[in-house]
């Protein structure tokens, strides 16, 4: 991996392919996600939480078997929305210290070792006269979401946990009469506890924007049915 800071002089003609695929880490049965995505995510994916050493993290369920992404077909996603952690492609944020400023600033980088970088059939990053293309603006927005999400997600999820809204469960998913999957060690928003919130706790979560996250995450669990339907459409999977 060779991350290089992007600029419109050295990379004026650089093109990058937005294609996806197993070679680029898209063959995964879950994707790390962040609060700013929840509204888009809940239309497509089930949102679950897991306790990690670094704290609570949220994930979108993508598949049931190991390395299975039921929303991936060849080199593109079939969902209307793609989690930002996968939208970013070969781009990343790197901290760069200016010559006259002791404070490091987040700057856009691209991995020159990624085969999508320099693809003649890819999308340009800069306009003819130096401005950013819509593709580069999109990538910048995705990375901003990820950067800000990593800063704010822990506090948001801790607020859900402190309010008693996250319940530990083992998801049981029946694809057919003969095939059952379990997803252990996850937490989901408890709908009954959410509905029972009243008074000051309810007001506090509402004003902090946490209540909305809880409602979106709870609603997203209905998408397990979509996951089952996609699994059943695979060859050799009986309904």
Locate the predicted segments by residue.
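A contiguous, surface-oriented mixed alpha/beta subdomain in the mid-to-C-terminal portion of proteins
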Residues: 100-239
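Short, basic/low-complexity N-terminal boundary segments at the transition from targeting/disordered tails
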Residues: 23-27, 64-70, 74-75, 149-155
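Short, surface-exposed charged micro-motifs
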Residues: 46, 83, 90-92, 172, ...
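Short acidic-glycine loop/turn motifs at beta-strand connectors
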Residues: 51-54, 95-99, 175-178
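Aromatic- and glycine-enriched beta-alpha-beta binding-site module
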Residues: 57-126
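Short linear motifs in intrinsically disordered
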Residues: 35-40, 82-84, 99, 162-165
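Short beta-strand-initiation
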Residues: 42-44, 81, 88, 168
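Short, extreme N-terminal leader segments that mark the start of a protein/domain
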Residues: 1-63
């Amino acid at each position: 991996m060779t991350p290089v800071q992007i600029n419109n002089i050295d990379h004026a003609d650089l093109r990058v392919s937005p294609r996806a695929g197993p070679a680029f880490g898209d063959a995964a049965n879950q994707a790390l996600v962040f609060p700013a995505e929840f509204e888009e995510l809940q239309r497509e994916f089930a949102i679950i939480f897991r306790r990690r050493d670094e704290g609570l993290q949220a994930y979108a369920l993508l598949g049931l078997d190991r390395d299975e992404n039921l929303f991936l077909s060849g080199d593109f996603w079939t969902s209307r929305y793609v989690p930002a952690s996968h939208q970013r492609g070969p781009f990343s944020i790197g901290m760069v210290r200016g010559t006259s400023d002791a404070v490091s600033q987040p700057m856009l980088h691209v991995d020159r070792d990624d085969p999508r970088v320099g693809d003649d059939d890819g999308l340009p990053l800069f306009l003819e006269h130096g401005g950013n293309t819509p593709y580069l603006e999109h990538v910048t927005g995705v990375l901003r979401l990820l950067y800000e999400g990593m800063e704010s997600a822990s506090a948001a999820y801790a607020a859900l946990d402190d309010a008693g809204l996250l319940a530990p469960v083992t998801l049981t998913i029946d694809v057919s009469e003969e095939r059952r999957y379990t997803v252990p060690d996850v937490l989901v928003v408890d709908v009954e506890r959410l509905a029972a919130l009243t008074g000051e706790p309810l007001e506090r979560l509402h004003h902090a924007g946490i209540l909305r996250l809880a409602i979106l995450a709870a609603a997203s669990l209905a998408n397990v049915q979509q996951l089952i339907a996609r699994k059943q459409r695979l060859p050799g999977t009986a309904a």
